[in-house]
């Protein structure tokens, strides 16, 4: 989905275009609330951890899912991911097979995640969870299903880009939100805010009022009446042995925040002589790649992109483009570790 600049204005001073579209945003919020309230989510016999967001578009969910997969696996727990498969044409339910499926079939995010654990794509999330359980999942990570009411969530994590926060605080199309912040956080168990220390400080300052109010925990995971836990995380480049210092690069990215990717390259010492921001999930057609390759050649630069974009590269260009992988580092895993422990305790109690 295309993001508009006026979505990122201060929530205290929305742009005139946002104010003009605000009645439509209110209708969107009402429709979301109605859909969520229609029926209770179905339980499938294993804990379900939802990783979602309030904003439309990318906020760092995929790196968060990867971090959770690795954390759970390190504890001896077998996680499977269930995804809608945004950008793919197959409706599922199916298990992603990296050597057989392509991004245009199952979506770029499921194809990337399949390198870390079993991933199941299903337009009907419930059918996807059923498939995961039959395949041996001990816990299911529901990728981007926070506003989907069909599956019961035992733990709901809202991911937010600390730099952008919740934008102007308004719902689509007046702002970037799928639902009002207060309504979404009332169903969340914790928030993961991703960004630099300065971005984290600005996020907490701009959204202090809504983050500091107490929320009743409807899922009874934390049994808390305190404020919502907010965990801080930062994206760090994965050490691959590549020395980026002085490397002339033509960087392109079709993710939620391409500028963050370009900044990471510069921080590593790369000379970003050309950069191109693409739409999130934008198809990397041969025509587009030929144009980017020509720009790189004219600049004497090496093409480089993100892991998520790399899985969408046409076969003829895969050996021409370098990839810079990043991973999410959380400052404190103890809150999530304790929550996971309680999930399995609650499961034992129900059974």
Describe the role of every protein-language-model region:
Residues 279-283, 320-350:
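Short, flexible loop segments at boundaries between secondary-structure elements
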Residues 51, 82, 160, 233, ...:
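Hydrophobic residues at beta-strand termini and immediately following loops
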Residues 1-11, 165-302, 349-351:
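C-terminal accessory "lid"/substrate-recognition subdomains
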Residues 33-101, 199:
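Walker A (P-loop) phosphate-binding motif
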Residues 78-82, 158, 248-252:
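Conserved beta-strand elements of the Class I
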Residues 2-48:
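A transmembrane-helix-recognition feature enriched in membrane-embedded lipid enzymes
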Residues 85-217, 221-223:
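Phosphate/Mg2+-binding loops and adjacent switch elements
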Residues 27, 62, 113, 143, ...:
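Residue-level signal for inorganic ion chemistry
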């Amino acid at each position: 989905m295309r993001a508009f600049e006026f979505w990122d204005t201060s929530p205290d001073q929305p742009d005139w275009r946002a104010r003009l579209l605000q009645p439509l945003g209110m209708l969107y919020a009402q429709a979301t609330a109605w859909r969520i309230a229609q029926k209770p989510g179905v339980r499938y016999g294993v804990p379900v951890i939802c990783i979602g967001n309030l904003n439309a578009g990318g906020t760092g969910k995929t790196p968060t899912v990867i971090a959770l997969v690795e954390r759970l696996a390190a504890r001896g727990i077998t996680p499977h991911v269930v995804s809608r498969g945004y950008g793919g044409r197959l409706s599922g339910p199916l298990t992603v097979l990296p050597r057989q499926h392509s991004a245009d079939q199952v979506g770029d995010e499921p194809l990337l995640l399949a390198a870390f654990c079993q991933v199941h794509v299903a337009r009907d999330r419930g059918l996807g969870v059923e498939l995961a359980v039959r395949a041996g999942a001990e816990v299911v990570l529901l990728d981007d299903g926070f506003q989907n009411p069909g599956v019961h969530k035992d733990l709901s994590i809202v991911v937010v880009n600390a730099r952008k926060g919740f934008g102007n605080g308004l719902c689509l199309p007046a702002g970037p939100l799928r639902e009002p912040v207060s309504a979404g956080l009332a169903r969340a168990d914790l928030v993961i805010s991703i960004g630099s220390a300065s971005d984290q400080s600005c996020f907490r300052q701009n959204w202090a009022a809504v983050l500091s109010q107490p929320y009743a925990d409807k899922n009874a995971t934390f049994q808390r009446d305190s404020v919502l836990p907010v965990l801080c995380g930062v994206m760090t480049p994965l050490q691959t042995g590549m020395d980026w210092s002085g490397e002339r690069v033509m960087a392109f990215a079709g993710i939620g925040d391409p500028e963050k990717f370009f900044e990471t390259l510069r921080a590593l010492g790369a000379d970003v002589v050309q950069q191109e921001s693409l739409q999130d999930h934008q198809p990397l057609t041969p025509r587009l790649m030929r144009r980017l390759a020509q720009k790189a050649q004219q600049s004497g630069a090496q093409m480089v992109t993100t892991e998520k974009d790399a899985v969408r590269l046409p076969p003829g260009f895969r050996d021409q483009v370098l990839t810079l992988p990043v991973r999410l580092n959380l400052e404190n895993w103890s809150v999530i570790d304790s929550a996971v422990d309680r999930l399995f305790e609650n499961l034992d109690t129900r059974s």
